Amino acid sequence: MTKPHDFKTKAIIVRKTKCGEADRILSLLTPDLGLIQGFAKSVRKTTSKLSGHLELLCYSEVSLARGKAIDTITGSQTIQSFLNIRNSLQLSAMAFYACELAYHFSPEEAANPALFQLLLSTLEELDNGSQPELCLKYFEINLLASSGYKPELRECANCHKKLQATINYYSPESGGVICPNCRNTQIGMPVSVNTVKVLRYIQENSFSSICRLKINREILSELELAIRANIRFVLEKEPKALFWLDSLRLADL
């Protein structure tokens, strides 16, 4: 979608970078333009009228003027600020992690409405307090799918035979779950029958449906190890927000 000289767009602020003494460069995830960068002049000054509308996690309607190197933000109005998330360290860490992933999985100026809606829905569900751990798993699995990395969960990702109800192996390098026979030639971590079932259910159902799931800590741990390995494989690095999220869990905050 071609941008006019002056334009408005709904956007989620997924990243902010200091620039000069009082300015910022903001990364905005939009439904129609994909990931775009915006220059926010003097937004770090206490007198700035825009600062409260351009914070990380804000869902806002943003006005921009097209520039040669970068667009300039000329106005912004908050649509949703997710106050419950901001008032909780744990939820904030989860939301920042989701925003970081959305940033890394979004090529600049390539529209991905499904990814935008996925992030917005995830922030709304986290703000509502609806099973935050499952909410994050739902986001991660569907993020992979909407970005072209949907893991194979019903047949072996290597030999393509139907998976049997036994211990199988999750292999990001192979593109999903592999069978015990292929484990001899491929790298993979063990996943139980129930973990694979939960992965399938999350991948194939709405968030309102997965909220009804009752998952024990062992399955949740297997899910986390598998999905994190997949994300790390795609990004070729560990998301920075994970360190904060894990430290809060260890401190039980």
Curated annotation (Swiss-Prot):
InterPro entries to which the protein is assigned, alphabetical: ARFGAP/RecO (IPR037278), DNA_rep/recomb_RecO_N (IPR022572), NA-bd_OB-fold (IPR012340), RecO (IPR003717), RecO_C (IPR042242)
SUPFAM superfamilies: ArfGap/RecO-like zinc finger, Nucleic acid-binding proteins
Coiled coil: none
GO annotation terms (biological process): DNA recombination; double-strand break repair
Keyword check for DNA damage: yes
One GO CC annotation: bacterial nucleoid
Secretion signal span: none
Pfam families, A to Z: RecO_C, RecO_N
Keywords, in A-Z order: DNA damage, DNA recombination, DNA repair
Origin superkingdom: Bacteria
Function text: Involved in DNA repair and RecF pathway recombination.
Protein family (similarity comment): Belongs to the RecO family.
Protein name: DNA repair protein RecO
